[in-house]
């Protein structure tokens, strides 16, 4: 690394060269400095592509850590469902409780990003960060959105679940189910030779768009290995033209946000192998918000098969009471 002044001096001394520069990762100041005396070729940093393709060991370890992380998240979800009616739980206390569950594993290092812990209208703020002045109590009738992740010594996680606190709204169930349909469409997307993230993003939105709704963010981003939770160059977004390749890891996180009322997002991490997406995240998906009548047979089978795997992989980490709750959360719809 360089002291900024020394770096500026060093770059000033480069003249009459052809320089490969990635403007997405280089500041305007340094780009402008180099352009004055050199010829710039603006291309994506090739290291991005190399880093985005995970090797077999990285994939193996990511599978392992997602089971560990999924157990922590599931214990938290069971605790939350069991206790929100009988004790005061706030966005801050819920966030701390979730991290405490993660800390129980010695390989956990720290959060992979600032946890988004939002109930009711705060859940509609896409990058919400709770503070003492915005901290809300989780109340009956709310839906609670928690987007969190961990950095472990052998992997990075990022997962979102939207939880019903006895919410009965038909509109919320309709929208939630359409978000889930989009999530499943991504999971089932058949990746061809030249498939890009923009094609997948379009598939994820189509069920919301049928009722003239949408979400104002990309459907997914690349994820690093004990590195940045947001990693390029691949993403599932409208303008991303990077070809999807075996070994890439991405998030799958469609959502919907009603300002002042609620937020919905369902996020798993997936990896690409043999031209298909495969689930890394292992945690129950909220069933009480699902409107089964707008799901087709393939989607119902996806949910039931996913939950069968969740129950199988996480059961050994649960207490007797937690196993009962896990079985209920993962029972067929």
Give, region by region, the residue ranges found by the protein language model.
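Active-site neighborhoods and metal-handling regions in enzymes and metal-associated proteins
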Residues: 1-333
């Amino acid at each position: 690394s360089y002291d900024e002044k020394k770096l500026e001096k060093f770059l000033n001394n480069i003249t009459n060269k052809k320089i490969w520069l990635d403007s997405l990762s280089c500041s305007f100041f340094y780009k402008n400095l180099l352009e004055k005396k050199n010829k710039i070729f603006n291309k994506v940093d090739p290291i991005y592509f190399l880093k985005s393709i995970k090797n077999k060991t990285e994939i193996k370890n990511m599978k392992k850590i997602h089971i560990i992380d999924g157990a922590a998240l599931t214990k938290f979800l069971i605790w939350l469902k069991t206790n929100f009616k009988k004790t005061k739980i706030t966005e801050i206390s819920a966030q701390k409780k979730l991290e405490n569950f993660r800390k129980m594993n010695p390989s956990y290092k720290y959060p992979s990003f600032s946890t988004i812990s939002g109930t009711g209208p705060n859940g509609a703020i896409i990058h919400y960060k709770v503070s003492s002045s915005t901290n809300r109590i989780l109340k009956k009738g709310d839906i609670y959105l928690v987007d969190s992740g961990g950095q472990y010594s052998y992997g990075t996680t990022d997962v979102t679940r939207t939880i019903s606190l006895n919410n009965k709204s038909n509109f919320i169930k309709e929208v939630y189910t359409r978000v889930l349909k989009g999530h499943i469409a991504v999971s089932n997307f058949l990746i061809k030779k030249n498939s890009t993230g923009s094609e997948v993003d379009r598939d994820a939105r189509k069920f919301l768009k049928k009722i003239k709704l949408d979400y104002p963010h990309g459907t997914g981003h690349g994820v690093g290995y004990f590195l940045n939770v947001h990693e390029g160059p691949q993403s599932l977004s409208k303008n991303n033209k990077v070809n999807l390749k075996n070994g890439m890891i991405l998030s799958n996180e469609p959502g919907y946000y009603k300002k002042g009322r609620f937020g919905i997002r369902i996020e798993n991490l997936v990896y690409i192998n043999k031209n298909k997406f495969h689930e890394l995240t292992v945690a129950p998906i909220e069933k009480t918000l699902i409107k089964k009548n707008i799901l087709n047979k393939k989607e119902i089978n996806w949910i039931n098969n996913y939950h069968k795997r969740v129950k199988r992989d996480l059961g050994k980490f649960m207490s007797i009471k937690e196993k009962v709750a896990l079985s209920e959360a993962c029972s067929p719809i």
